[in-house]
């Protein structure tokens, strides 16, 4: 794909984030995305066969951004607990910074039918697997006691999902206020001492975006 084509495709996706996050999936029409992106219907259909494919592409885009950020954050770090901490922190930061995408991923993709549910479950499995891998590393390094990391990873996903969905709907609590107690609760749940949690990288200042 040429650079020009990539720019056009990204413009369409960025426009779709705004339209879907404001109107919802069912109320959004392809014409709305065409208008918001300042492209043409032909251009939109050249890259995406329909509204469903645009929506699924946005879910993939959010998942890719999230995973790339997590990998970039933890790669320079050898400490297992710190890697878990950074992965969790980046996850919450990304949801906060890409609120429109988070709304699409966590809220609107629920209950839209089998295709969307399959995609959503695939991504839950993908990120539960990432969390599990970092917990396994912490166990291998002797930093936490052996636990069933698969079960814990899905429990963590559930906790993160609930607090972020509330934030997406209400804007509360503020991201910085959300991260610190949630991180402490999750890390204590796998046996990380309070004193060790206090030594971890501090919560950064987070700027929320609409897309």
Predicted segment positions?
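Generic hydrophobic, amphipathic alpha-helix propensity
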Residues: 8-16, 33, 54, 58-66, ...
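Amphipathic alpha-helical segments used for helix-helix packing
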Residues: 96-115, 132-133, 165-169, 199-201
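Hydrophobic alpha-helical connector segments
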Residues: 57, 71-100, 152-156, 176-179, ...
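N-terminal intrinsically disordered/low-complexity leader segments
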Residues: 1-7, 147, 196-211
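Helix-turn-helix
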Residues: 11, 19-53, 57
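Amphipathic alpha-helical packing segments from all-alpha helical-bundle domains
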Residues: 67, 71, 115-140, 150-154, ...
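Amphipathic, non-transmembrane alpha-helical scaffold segments
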Residues: 5, 13, 59, 63, ...
């Amino acid at each position: 794909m040429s650079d020009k084509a990539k720019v056009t495709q990204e413009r369409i996706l960025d426009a779709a984030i705004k339209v879907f996050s404001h109107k919802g999936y069912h109320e959004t029409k392809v014409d709305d995305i065409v208008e918001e992106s300042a492209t043409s219907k032909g251009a939109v259909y050249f890259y995406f066969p329909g509204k469903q494919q645009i929506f699924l592409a946005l879910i993939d885009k959010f998942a890719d951004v999230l995973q790339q950020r997590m990998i970039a954050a933890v790669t320079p770090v050898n400490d297992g607990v710190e890697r878990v901490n950074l992965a969790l922190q980046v996850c919450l930061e990304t949801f906060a910074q890409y609120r429109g995408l988070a709304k699409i991923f966590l809220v609107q993709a629920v209950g839209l039918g089998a295709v969307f549910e399959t995609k959503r479950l695939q991504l839950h499995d993908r990120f539960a697997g990432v969390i599990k891998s970092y917990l396994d590393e912490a166990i291998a390094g002797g930093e936490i006691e052996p636990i069933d990391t698969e079960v814990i990873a899905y429990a963590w996903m559930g906790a993160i999902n609930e607090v972020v969905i509330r934030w997406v709907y209400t804007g509360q609590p503020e991201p910085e206020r959300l991260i610190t107690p949630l991180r402490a609760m999750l890390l204590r749940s796998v046996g990380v001492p309070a004193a060790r949690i206090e030594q971890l990288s501090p919560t950064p200042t987070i700027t929320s975006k609409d897309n």
